[in-house]
Curated annotation (Swiss-Prot):
SUPFAM superfamilies according to UniProt: Nucleotidylyl transferase
UniProt pathway annotation: Cofactor biosynthesis; coenzyme A biosynthesis; CoA from (R)-pantothenate: step 4/5
Gene3D superfamilies in the record: HUPs
This enzyme's EC code(s): 2.7.7.3
Record carries keyword rRNA-binding: no
Marked site (Transition state stabilizer) residue numbers: H17
Name of the protein: Phosphopantetheine adenylyltransferase
GO terms, molecular function: ATP binding; pantetheine-phosphate adenylyltransferase activity
C-alpha cells in the first residue's frame, strides 16, 4: 500500500486543501492529512478543532484521513509508513520555501519522496489566511471552504466579539 502524508496547519481547511488531497488519492492508496500540533505561528483553531473540521470536510473522500503529529514531518511520515510527503503549490512564491523544506526532508530520509501538486485553477488563489481575514471582517467565505468550516468561523469570531 502506497501511503502519503499531506502536512499542514489547516487553519482552517479550504477547498484548495481538499482538492490537493483528492488529487493525491489518484497517486497514492491512502493520504493522511497531517495536522501539525506545534506550529510556530498563532492559530485560530486548536489542534482538536482543526482535526474535527478536517475529518468532517473529508468524510466523503475515500482513502483520506486526518491525524495530528508533533514531530518532524519526515519522522511522522516514517512512523505511519508513508513513502511520500505531498505538498501543494499555489504560486511561484510558494516554491522557494517548499524547495528548501524538501531538501531538508531528503537529507533526513532520502527514502521519502516529496511530491508537489500544483493548485487547480479554481483554487490557486485560496489561502487559509484569506479565509480567516474574510471571516474576521464578517464575510462568510462560502466559496472557499466547506460549510462546517464557515459555521466554525462564525462561532469563533462571535466569541471574540
Amino acid at each position: 500500500m502506497r501511503i502519503a502524508i499531506y502536512p499542514g496547519s489547516f487553519d482552517p481547511v479550504t477547498y484548495a486543501h481538499l482538492d490537493i488531497a483528492r488529487r493525491a488519492t489518484r497517486i497514492f492508496d491512502r493520504v493522511i492529512m497531517a495536522v501539525f500540533d506545534r506550529p510556530q505561528k498563532r492559530l485560530l483553531f486548536s489542534t482538536e478543532e482543526r482535526l474535527h473540521l478536517l475529518r468532517t470536510a473529508t468524510a466523503d473522500l475515500d482513502h483520506v484521513e486526518a491525524m495530528s503529529y508533533n514531530t518532524l514531518t519526515v519522522e511522522f511520515a516514517r512512523q505511519v509508513g508513508a513513502c511520500a510527503i505531498v505538498r501543494g503549490l499555489r504560486a511561484g512564491s510558494d516554491f522557494e520555501a517548499e524547495f528548501q523544506m524538501a531538501q531538508v526532508n531528503q537529507t533526513i530520509d532520502p527514502g521519502i519522496e516529496v511530491v508537489v501538486l500544483m493548485a487547480g485553477r479554481p483554487f490557486a488563489h485560496i489561502s487559509s489566511t484569506a479565509v480567516r481575514e474574510m471571516a474576521s471582517l464578517g464575510r462568510d467565505p462560502v466559496e472557499f471552504t466547506p460549510p462546517v468550516v464557515v459555521a466554525a468561523l462564525r462561532e469563533k469570531f462571535a466569541q471574540r466579539g
